[in-house]
Amino acid sequence: MYIICTYADITTIRRFNTMKQFMDKDFLLSTDTAKALFHDYAENMPILDYHCHINPKEIAEDRKFENITQVWLGGDHYKWRQMRSNGVDEYYITGGASDREKFQKWAETLTKAIGNPLYHWSHLELQRYFDYHGVLNGDTAEEVWNICNAKLADDSMTVRNIIKKSGVTLICTTDDPVDSLEYHKQIAEDPTFDVQVLPAWRPDKAMNIEKPDYTDYHAKLSEVSGVEVKSFEGLKEALVKRMAFFDSMGCRASDHALEYVMYKPATAEEIEAIFAKRLGGAALTKEEELKFKTAFMTFVGKEYNKLGWAMQLHYGAKRDNNVFRYNQLGPDTGYDCINTYSSSAEMADFLNSMNATDELPKTIIYSLNPIDNAAIGTVLGCFQDSTAVGKIQQGSAWWFNDHKVGMTDQMTSLANLGLLGNFIGMLTDSRSFLSYTRHEYFRRIMCELLGKWVENGEYPADMKTLGGMVRDISYNNAVRYFGFKLDTVEK
């Protein structure tokens, strides 16, 4: 008997003999060194999520989700953007469509997301939390919907159990100075839940003097602090009191969302005059706004140094560009983009102003523009000292950059210009409790990068040293850097 094979048949046979399985155990790992580093060192490390946007109330109340749409699409503007790009009507995104209809539209959109991290994240979450190893698309949406919802109905999939299942030891939420932190307190006092949930200080509303509701915010700050905010000195006093409260609740980090890092110094008298002008209802010039924000950031930075907090600077986003949709849906709904203005010179001046008086805190710098990687890498080296290992850090690839290429580029640039071994690693920056797989995604990409360097002869195949480095970047460095009350994992 003769079997006649066409060229296409032979090509297909060869391809299936060599092609990797879809997102198998060695997903993103192409070398033996990368596989060993991930499976032997990175894979089972705990997770320390030092920056995210999850709601502590949902942890305190141990929320149980009714369906996968609530988990995936309730507030995920990453997914919303792609659904809009696929021509999906807003009714099925943030509108009144049923959860099942919204999930269907997302499944149909996901098919086209080849090369997008959402494709990988979604399938990692399906594998790790729902034991589904198939492919989500429009045709399989009903099957996946039923599988996920059946799992979510089980008590093992409450918010707290998801966190424990993920291997999380500590979470830092994002909190305003006026927040009561009542849910953090409730969690901390619950002996049945041993994951630390700590606040992180986010004082953007106290700084953004140009916003129309700025004076209204000061009324809230005055109430919770017991300090009447009628001057910049009063504002500083109120903030110091709230910082002390946050510190007592375990806070070890601040976070700032900046359009860019500014540095426009002014005298104390000028700042008081600018503050009084704004409280009087007058509009400020751009120069006055920048002077005030410079004074604000310099003040809080020095206070962070006293407290031993780390200062996180997230900059480079131009937000709320679609005014029509902003008026309908509000902020954080998927209408932001990268701001191409480079502020590395001002950033260096800003850091130098605190360093000159020995008051520069530990600082983590994130730019949304990947072009800034090298500039940040060189700024880091200007302000390192012996007070902390890797005192000034470049943050992990952020938002529009937390994909395979973005993470690889960020770590490569950091390695080229600094010490990758001191990097504090990944964070979710997410509003979803299923996003902890992003730590796995990052670790796979990191191990692939290190593995290629080793197998190319660029670094010794010393698995003890490499394994320690992988563990450190995955978890230990962040424990040490922030000073959290956690044990490191050395073996």
Regions flagged by a language model, labelled:
Residues 20-307, 359-361, 365-377, 381-491:
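Metal-cofactor-binding active-site regions of metalloenzymes
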Residues 311-313:
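C-terminal amphipathic alpha-helical interaction region
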Residues 341-347:
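Divalent-cation-assisted or electrostatically stabilized phosphate/pyrophosphate-binding catalytic cores
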Residues 326-334:
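Short glycine/proline- and charge-enriched loop/turn segments
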Residues 1-18:
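Short, Lys/Arg-enriched N-terminal segments with co-localized hydrophobic residues
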Residues 322:
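Hard-cation-handling environments
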Residues 288, 333-337:
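Metal/cofactor-centered catalytic core regions of large enzymes
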Residues 350-356:
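Short, basic/hydrophobic alpha-helical segments
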